[in-house]
Swiss-Prot record:
Disulfide bonds join 101-187. One of its GO terms (biological process) is adenylate cyclase-activating adrenergic receptor signaling pathway. Brain and kidney. Residues 55-65, 125-143, 220-264, 335-465 are cytoplasmic. This is D(1C) dopamine receptor. Its main location: membrane. InterPro entries: Dopamine_rcpt, GPCR_Rhodpsn, GPCR_Rhodpsn_7TM.
Amino acid sequence: MENFSIFNVTVNVWHADLDVGNSDLSLRALTGLLLSLLILSTLLGNTLVCLAVIKFRHLRSKVTNFFVISLAVSDLFVALLVMPWKAVTEVAGFWVFGDFCDTWVAFDIMCSTASILNLCIISLDRYWAIASPFRYERKMTQRVAFIMIGVAWTLSILISFIPVQLSWHKSHEADEELNGVNHTENCDSSLNRTYAISSSLISFYIPVVIMIGTYTRIYRIAQTQIRRISSLERAVEHAQRCSSRLSNENSLKTSFRKETKVLKTLSIIMGVFVFCWLPFFVLNCMIPFCHMNLPGQNEPEPPCVSETTFNIFVWFGWANSSLNPVIYAFNADFRKAFTTILGCNRFCSSNNVEAVNFSNELVSYHHDTTFQKDIPVTFNNSHLPNVVDQDQEVLEGTCFDKVSVLSTSHGTRSQKNLHLPAGVQFECEAEITLETITPFTSTGPLECLPQLVADEDRHYTTKLY
């Protein structure tokens, strides 16, 4: 009877171990599937960006797109040189690649840093294009862009391969703890405090402060221009009819909606970046101090963060590389290139009015961004500046085209482009975007009102990025 009881206990323990093993196997299979989907989406998105620029010359002609390409290359490196090795480790439960560990750690630091620094460069490029568009047009050449990109990649290499190959990054306490343990099965980077803080400052904290500052300034500039345009619209409405109270209310509501749209887009750009990377870099600076032994303490303190929690936040940071193509390279030009590459021209919608997206545009634009009013004819139409042809604007308009001349001399445009049936059209920007922010020049607003229309041969519009 006693032997039978022992047999039952043994069988029950065996079944329990089998259930645990099946559960662990299912969890690893699910983890492998999710990580594989993340890697494939990162590869697909960033490969499409690179192919689009290689295939379409007009995308290579814009200096701004050089920064987007550099970002896509760094994210591709994350998907090729970093993610797969860690995914295999997560599924297997241990590091299976032996002495490749140090090289992998260096690739991880280099690619992640390059991706973040490229995001910082894009924010600076946008700010300069918006704050000083005419100077940006002159100064931001291909040579300057390549220098900025080169600095970002050089800095990424300097803080990754040199310290890792010289073992400056390792924690001596972690090395002592690993004595007697097979190092080839554990690829724990265990950074020392000095390297953890200095690398985190360069890789994340300084860039994120710069990005917050630049995008805050971009929002304030956009807000100012929205309100100026709103005041012009109210002036036009007041010139047409005496009852201006209703028009003022509508104009204020429109202005508020535009400001909200700009703020929402910028919040998503910064929110996604901070959400993905901030938890990892907080832990990255905190963990080296958690392993510090107090004086007189015989046993080391337990780690303040579990390995599972840390790995989850590592993958959160890498997931940012899969989102960057959607945020920074999904504007009208790139979308058309993507549909051509994927061969879905026949099935994809080609509506001229773009929906709100979170690409290079601050707020997605309409292909016709001209605010047009019909007013009874009270003066000569020839005093109007030439109106931009819609097809011309479609060709010129995508992300951050800096400053473009949108119209030429009166003799180069036919009168039919004015579309003036029984009234006069006035050209005044109604949409604040990173494409066209304002009809204002350095000397003041362009004359959108009938009483102020001047006979000028050239009409400049400031374009954002």
